[in-house]
């Protein structure tokens, strides 16, 4: 009997799906296609060609793709190789709580079959609370139960606005996660004119004041410009005890940072060093001033003041920033002060936008404030492997350094 199956058909977006086909002709070659429309109607598609075994069966966990968007054994390849129909599209889940991404799997040419898989960014029982207290704007995701839960602030970068999908997944794993907006949202400034660290301290205090949040410290997960801010929080805010910085910088760039009476002026950028590739996208990697330059020392973040643990997640094919160099400078700075509270995980072939696993690589996209698309980099196969491994390491890091009371076995995990 012919059958196309995907198990589980409904799951968290960071869970793998087992795809199988039965009832084909022996050694038959077939095409599998995945397609998805985001909430704005943008289409993303992938496909791969497979040969059934002598029993007429196909199992993506052990059978290699012969061609298409990837080659070899990649059980989740149809998911992470999804590509936008329109150039420079980025797949972002906007509505986290009430609707999944629906991915359609199609088998053809003969026989034809189709099924749908649901990919959720939150789990049953998770609560979403809109936060509009004082100056703080965001969305707090609470796991089911009374808690207390380890708290995490979630920061994205120059895209601005409020992105909630990573916070929703963190809540599904037992963390209370505050997706925090800091510009281009609600009544916040439309452009990032400065980084006001007092705002982020207000958010940390608000999170810790919630009755379901474990005290005395919180974590931060951050990427790109957000990771620059996340590192500043680790340096200056005693509330922050565990920080993940994904492809960020170790100094202040673009706009000044203010905290109480302190002002850090930004290191200048040199836009004349911009490179535009054949697709019309911009590579910014070589545009930044060097934090090691004596004139820029006042802009370097004092990482030696950080009291908590810091994990740098680095994609070595980052086309936006020389993120490995920045992380190495930060770790050297720690070591020169006799500190050992930071470490770096390097991922060859991974680009700038390292996301939760099984999401597609975004090699380049349009972003706020730039007239041309920006290059993020990444090799699809290596980037997918990096996202899977990095997410495991991030969850393990927060369980080890934040959630000891909640997950008593976490130090051995």
Language-model features: where?
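Short, solvent-exposed beta-strand-terminating loops
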Residues: 251-259, 343-366
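Ser/Thr-rich low-complexity repeats and stalk/linker segments
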Residues: 34-85
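Serine-hydrolase catalytic core
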Residues: 281-353, 386-392, 399-400, 405
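Catalytic active-site module of serine/aspartate enzymes centered on a nucleophile-bearing elbow/loop
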Residues: 360-413
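Cap/lid segment of the alpha/beta-hydrolase catalytic domain
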Residues: 135, 147-209, 216, 255-258, ...
């Amino acid at each position: 009997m012919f059958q196309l199956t995907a198990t589980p058909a409904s799951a968290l977006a960071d869970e793998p799906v087992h795809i199988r086909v039965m009832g084909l002709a022996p050694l038959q070659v077939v095409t599998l296609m995945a397609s998805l429309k985001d909430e704005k109607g943008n289409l993303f598609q992938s496909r791969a060609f497979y040969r059934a075994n002598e029993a007429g069966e196909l199992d993506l966990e052990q059978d290699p793709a012969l061609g298409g968007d990837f080659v070899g054994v990649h059980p989740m390849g149809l998911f992470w190789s999804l590509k936008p129909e329109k150039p420079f599209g980025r797949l972002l889940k906007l509505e986290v709580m009430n609707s999944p991404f629906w991915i359609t799997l199609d088998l053809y040419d003969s026989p034809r079959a189709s099924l749908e898989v649901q990919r959720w960014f939150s789990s049953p029982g998770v609560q979403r609370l809109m936060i509009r207290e004082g100056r703080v704007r965001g969305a707090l995701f609470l796991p089911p139960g009374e808690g207390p839960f380890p708290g995490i602030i979630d920061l994205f970068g120059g895209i601005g606005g409020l992105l909630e999908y990573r916070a929703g997944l963190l809540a599904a794993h037992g963390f209370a996660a505050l997706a925090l907006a800091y510009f281009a949202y609600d009544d916040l400034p439309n452009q990032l004119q400065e980084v006001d660290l007092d705002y982020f301290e207000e958010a940390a205090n608000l999170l810790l004041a919630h009755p379901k949040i474990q005290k005395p410290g919180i974590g931060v997960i951050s990427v790109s410009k957000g990771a620059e801010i996340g590192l500043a929080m680790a340096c200056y805010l005693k509330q922050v005890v565990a920080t993940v910085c994904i492809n960020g910088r170790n100094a202040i760039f673009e706009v000044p940072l203010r905290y109480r009476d302190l002002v850090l002026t930004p290191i200048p950028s040199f836009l004349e060093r911009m490179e535009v590739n054949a697709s019309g996208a911009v590579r910014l990697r070589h545009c930044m001033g060097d934090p090691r330059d004596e004139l820029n020392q006042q802009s370097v973040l004092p990482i030696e003041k950080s009291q908590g643990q810091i994990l740098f997640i680095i994609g070595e094919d980052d086309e936006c920033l020389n993120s490995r160099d920045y992380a190495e400078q930060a770790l050297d700075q720690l070591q020169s002060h006799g500190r050992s509270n930071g470490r770096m995980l390097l991922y060859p072939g991974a680009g700038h936008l390292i996301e939760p696993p099984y999401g597609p690589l975004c090699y380049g996209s349009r972003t706020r404030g730039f007239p041309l698309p920006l290059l993020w980099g990444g090799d699809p196969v290596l980037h997918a492997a990096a996202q899977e491994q990095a997410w495991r390491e991030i969850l393990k890091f927060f369980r080890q350094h934040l959630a000891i009371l909640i997950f008593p076995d976490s130090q051995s995990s």
